[in-house]
Amino acid sequence: MNTVNETGPHKGRYLFTVFETGQSGVQRIDLLTGETETIWQGPAPGSHVAFDASYWTPWGSFITAEESWTTAAAGATSPYGRLFELKNPTTARGITLPLTASSNHDADFAHQTVVPRVSHEGIQFDQQGSMYFIDELNGGNVYKFTSAAKWGEIMSGRANYFDAGQTFVLRVGSGSVPNATGTFTWVPFTDANGVGLNGALTITDVNGVSSVDGRNTTNLAAFKGTDYQRPEDLQLQTVAGRQYLYMATTTTNEVYRIDLQRNLITVFADRATIDLATGAAAGAALSSPDNLAIDHDGNIYIIEDRNGGVDDDIWFARDLNMDGDLADAGEGLARWASNGTTGSEFTGLYFDPTDKRRAWVNIQHPASGNDRTIEITIR
């Protein structure tokens, strides 16, 4: 995925993306000079894997996380499922190859162990400072982390957001019905310091690092979260001061809308949604929604995970009255872009927050082996 430095000195100058590989890393593109640098990379194959999220925090750091975790009733011991914070993303010097023991020494890059282990993808922060994340799994859940630190102290640099905090899982009803919609509650499974509540699964991984196991804890009856089918990306939208969280689920071909004020989850888009090009239901034309994006006007975009050489599209969701459904006259889905690169998929569509006429998208794992970051401009 992609993000720019949304705050601080040189705001909007740098574009960041990550390597979703078996030796993950973080790349920075200087949009002023065109220089591209890797500013952090896993020191060895398998040490850090499947970085997916790219998110600029409100206090000016960069976070990413691993899309890799294990289902195990007693708790997993995988070294992965971690969330990392790069605290000096604009000033860390680019590394040179070959990698050595000192290659990453200029990057202040930390595993934030207070965040439970899951297979991470989408990450978003609301206006109150809560962080939302998912577990990318058939049967995965939606989570909220709330820092114990005061927001003003975090923003001024006097406190660390990830020093302590509480994590919750979203539950509709008893949590027993998968893909449920309706009123939900946030069920805590750690205390305010991030320590697992009684019965939660705290694991020590093969590297000797301890964390709460988010996935396997929220499969337990006491902490059961509502299961969704491969929840992937998240996107926050603000309408008239109210905050809504959108979530794509790849297996069920749906996008959900989570009303954070009313604690209500509904379906925003699915295969029954009108394709504005035909006037009929989108049907199988909408498949495997993966990433989400939002433009300056608050419109939601849905990015598919399909075969780029055949049928991989980005859909524009036309919600004229911003009421969270696409059922009103003139509303529906329209293809905004189509991929044409064999073996690839679109990923990481991101609209420049400083220029409403510019966006970026990645072409990931093409058959040629040549990944690309593409800039899209409207003039």
State each model region's role:
Residues 1-379:
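Sequence/structural signature of beta-propeller domains
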